[in-house]
């Protein structure tokens, strides 16, 4: 029978190494589903064997993309990661848990596509963009303003804004730009980049802003962190509409769902589309 303590230690070491490759080197060695399986197994073992608590665990963190070359800034509100799922059954269970937590409320869900990019937090003070910060370790991240400010379509000022506003989103690279850059590198005999997400992650951490500008990045905004004064928004759908009013690049397609799907024929499928 496997030793749970040894398996926990092994999984923590494996996940920590994969976090380093993904967040700091932008060169993941395994795909997202394989990584999620490792993390799910570790979470299961930690829940079953709390006596083997060795301190910090990768199940309790969001990785860390900070590097020494950049100045770090503390997020006014932590940037947390979202749980994910690959099955409709887990999605239904999620809805059931929320129904038990809020038995007297009729819950409406906002459903939107997920862009596989690099998380970023934009800080606006009195309507002016003052800083762009990477997720980092969720508490503080790297100041990447010089590489984010030039992104086409990103407003450097917004009207009728709260005194302090953190806007959260994803920086990504379209497939056409990725293929253009890799084509040029191939012609020069240089190593090719693995995928658009890795190239976007590497681009925002370039020390030469001119080189970063030569690579076309895109950005999509979908959420709000700190907002001072508070109580500015009461629902995610309001955030979506206000971001659009402020001329932020947003996902135009999203849906409001009255409850989680309980039965569907054919079965619910989770799919993606190419950008």
Question: Where do the language-model regions lie?
Answer:
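RNA/tRNA-interacting regions in translation and RNA-turnover enzymes
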Residues: 1-275
């Amino acid at each position: 029978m496997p030793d749970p303590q040894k398996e926990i230690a092994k999984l923590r070491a494996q996940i920590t190494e994969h976090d380093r490759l993904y967040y700091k080197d932008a060169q993941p060695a395994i795909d997202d589903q394989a990584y999620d399986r490792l993390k799910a197994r570790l979470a299961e073992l930690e829940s079953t064997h709390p006596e083997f608590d060795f301190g910090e665990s990768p199940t309790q963190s969001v990785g860390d993309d900070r590097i020494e070359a950049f100045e770090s800034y503390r997020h006014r509100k932590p940037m947390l990661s979202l749980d994910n799922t690959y099955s409709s059954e887990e999605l239904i269970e999620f809805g059931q848990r929320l129904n038990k937590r809020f038995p007297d409320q009729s819950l409406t869900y906002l459903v939107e596509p997920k862009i596989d990019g690099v998380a970023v937090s934009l800080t606006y003070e009195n309507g002016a963009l003052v800083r762009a910060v990477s997720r980092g370790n969720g508490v503080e991240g790297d100041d990447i303003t010089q590489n984010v400010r030039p992104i086409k379509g990103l407003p450097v000022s917004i009207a009728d804004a709260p005194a302090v506003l953190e806007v959260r989103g994803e920086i990504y690279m379209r497939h056409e730009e990725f293929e253009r850059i890799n084509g040029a590198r191939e012609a020069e005999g240089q190593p090719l980049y693995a995928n658009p997400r890795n190239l976007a992650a590497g681009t925002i951490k370039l020390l030469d802003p001119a080189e970063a500008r030569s690579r076309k990045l895109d950005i999509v905004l979908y959420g709000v962190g700190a907002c001072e004064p508070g109580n500015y928004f009461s629902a995610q759908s309001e955030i979506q509409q206000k971001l659009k009013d402020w001329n932020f690049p947003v996902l135009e397609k999203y849906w409001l769902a009255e409850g989680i799907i309980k039965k569907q024929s054919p079965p619910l499928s989770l799919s993606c589309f190419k950008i």
